[in-house]
Amino acid sequence: MGFPRASGILLHISSLPSEFGIGDFGPASYLFIDYLKSAGQKYWQILPIGPPGYGNSPYNCLSAFAGNTAFISPKLLAAEGLLPKSFAKPRADGIAAAAAARIETIRPAFEIFKQTSNEQLKAEFRRFCDENGFWLEDYALYQVIKSRSGQAAWINWEAGLRDRDEGALAAVRRNEEDAIEREKFFQFIFFRQWDALRRYAAENGVGIIGDVPLYVAHDSADVWASPRNFKLNEDGTPRVVAGVPPDYFSKTGQRWGNPIYEWEKMRDEGFGWWIMRLHFNLRLFDAVRIDHFIGFTRAWEVPGTDKTAENGRWAAVPGRELFYALGQALGGLKFIAEDLGDVTPEVEALRDDFGLPGMRVLQFGFGGDAGNIHLPHNYVQNTVVYTGTHDNETAVGWRMARRKGGGAGALKHCLKYLDSDGRQIHRDFIRAVYASAGNLAIVPMQDVLGLDNRARMNLPGTIGGNWEWRCKPGDFSGKTAKALRELSELFGR
């Protein structure tokens, strides 16, 4: 799939302005779509919207299908009569506390729903449960057991539940029927609010780009419900986990800890789980960015008991067969290949043979020679180009860091290349990617606003302080919208 020549903004749902401490699908999300339209932007890119697990990372979710119920808007629930007009509005510091407070705020909606006379809403709920039973039943059960087990990982549950003994699961279904139904209800509300938001975006000419991580967390409903899809020991512990080998930046490599797929079994079964997963996501989004695309050619398998990634080994992945099966089943591959990192000829061939646009990041272009693929004069049309991603510094922060510390050569190269004095480096970055040949240019909202690294979304390899940044109510201004629209028109986006 290729994109038309266009531009868009990267802003996660949690980063929308909110009086509750975390963004949601409420009025601010509709206001942002209005802003995108007025700014001449055709796309809104977000991060994964699943329920986050360890570290609150959206890339480490408890399910490959479920939604993060902290994104449910209390205001929209109240407007439907599913919360009192004067619902509680607790304030919380930090995204984890804000998410927990949000879930408590919306909890009464389930009891109100059970008493409602709105038969149409009840019918919608039943239809949602029927259509999504292939993941919803296991996810609701997983969440209820996890809650009653003190949030312990499934590997630490009592043996009968851990190993999915039918008698043990039947007892939970019988004793926790109401709690299971509540989990299903809030998933119903999540996707109902999301569908309404996406319809509004489409009506205003804005496409939404989602994000799918390659791997799932070990402590997830997917691994618990379908252990045969993963390389696990008899007791459910991972035989091997994902990571990357030692390199210049890390002498011991990186041990991510995600279980590795049983690719051979998945291939023998026609890649059914992958087809379901990506079909599900393409119902939610206009296109999907696939994280760690290079992992579809080979995986660095680290022994599950090792503390570092030093003793890993490369294992082949049948990516070509997978994408052929996806193309046959889905009728089109509306994907962006996140092909950053150690890109081998095999990765390039897989990307190009299936016509997938890759990624280029302007920040990575400076400090080397003119052949750097991240410099705009080297971009090709079937590419999505960024000033930076959620893992990068902001443009302003990038300049400040190189003025104060190392990287002076990269900054000098940057300023010369962009013919810039650096005072409005974020605008220079935006202009450079807009002017490039890459069909789709995406700019993080932090760069639109010219913010420094205090607004950085994520610092890879660290825990704490990430995923916290949020827009302020006045950030969707006519001034920045006008500037973006003028650039979009100037460069035919």
Tell where the protein language model's regions lie, with residue ranges.
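Catalytic domains of carbohydrate-active enzymes, especially glycoside hydrolases
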Residues: 2, 27-52, 284-285, 433
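Alpha-amylase-like alpha-glycosidases and glucanotransferases acting on alpha-linked glucans and related
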Residues: 2-5, 10-12, 18, 56-191, ...
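N-terminal catalytic cores of NTP/NDP-binding nucleotidyl/phosphoryl-transfer enzymes
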Residues: 8-33
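Surface-exposed amphipathic alpha-helices with a cationic face
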Residues: 37, 194-202, 327, 351-352
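Short acidic catalytic loops
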Residues: 44-48, 201, 207-213, 281-295
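Conserved, well-ordered alpha-helix/loop/beta-strand core segments that scaffold catalytic motifs
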Residues: 183-216
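Terminal-tail/helix-coil boundary detector
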Residues: 469, 473-493
